[in-house]
A protein has these predicted regions:
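N-terminal membrane-targeting/pre-transmembrane regions
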Residues: 1-17
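Membrane-interfacial hairpin junctions
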Residues: 27-37
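Transmembrane alpha-helices and immediately adjacent membrane-cytoplasm interface residues
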Residues: 40-64
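Membrane-cytosol interface motif
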Residues: 66-84
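A structural signal for short beta-strand/turn segments enriched in small hydrophobics and glycine
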Residues: 76-78, 115, 174-183
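Short, conserved beta-turn/loop elements at beta-strand boundaries and strand-helix junctions
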Residues: 82-86, 122-126
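Short histidine-centered loop motifs in beta-beta connectors
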Residues: 110, 157-178
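Single conserved hydrophobic/aromatic residue that forms the stacking wall/gate
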Residues: 184-195
Length: 195
């Protein structure tokens, strides 16, 4: 396992803040001889910092390639499976599968299919809670369409949540992508839909 490069700055800043808070607690609490409270604050700050480090973890995965399959692009829980009318690019009825990523899930996303990136668009928007039904259409999001070698097209979206403010995408139109290649890092809990 390694740490995603998008997390280096946040991990460093949060580590510095935790050290500063610990130093303040030390000087405030040791003078009062409240050692048990000092140990408790040390534990809380360490757990907070380890949580931030774990949020940016990028586990090594066995990359499987199968051109007949569409792989789940992220960790999480399937919350919606329904037929929808896709009006942005494909303009037809498609099967939508939405996956909710909680704060404890790995926030790396992988390309669900291999092929050529045919369409990519960033949509500014609101920051509704990720499980809100309108979050798929009203929240900040990116939309990507990959054309597989067979000609079939797969559309997938990264959708920001209530706390999310950043979606970092590595996609460009015309780019050839491999199935299960690292696609994006989402810096907060979110929802992911693909059609």
């Amino acid at each position: 396992m390694r740490i995603n490069k998008e997390g280096y700055k946040i991990i460093g800043i949060s580590g510095a803040v935790c050290l500063l808070l610990w130093w303040l607690f030390y000087h405030l609490l040791v003078h009062d001889a409240n050692v048990s409270l000092l140990w408790f604050s040390t534990l809380v700050l360490l757990l907070f910092w380890f949580f931030i480090v774990a949020f940016f973890r990028e586990p090594r995965r066995v990359r499987i390639h199968d051109t007949d399959l569409v792989f789940a692009p992220c960790d999480g829980r399937v919350v919606v499976t329904e037929v929808v009318s896709e009006d942005e690019y494909l303009k037809e009825e498609m099967l939508q599968i939405s996956i909710f990523m909680s704060i404890t899930n790995v926030h790396m996303n992988w390309v669900p299919v291999g092929g050529e990136v045919e369409y990519f668009k960033y949509h500014p928007g609101r920051f509704l809670v990720a499980w809100h039904p309108k979050s798929s259409t009203e929240n900040e999001r990116t939309t990507t369409v990959v054309r597989m070698p067979s000609g079939q097209k797969v559309l997938f979206r990264q959708i920001a949540g209530l706390i999310a403010r950043r979606i970092i995408s590595y996609m460009t139109v015309g780019h050839q992508v491999e199935q299960n290649l690292s696609l994006i890092h989402i810096s907060e809990p979110t929802r992911r839909s693909y059609i």
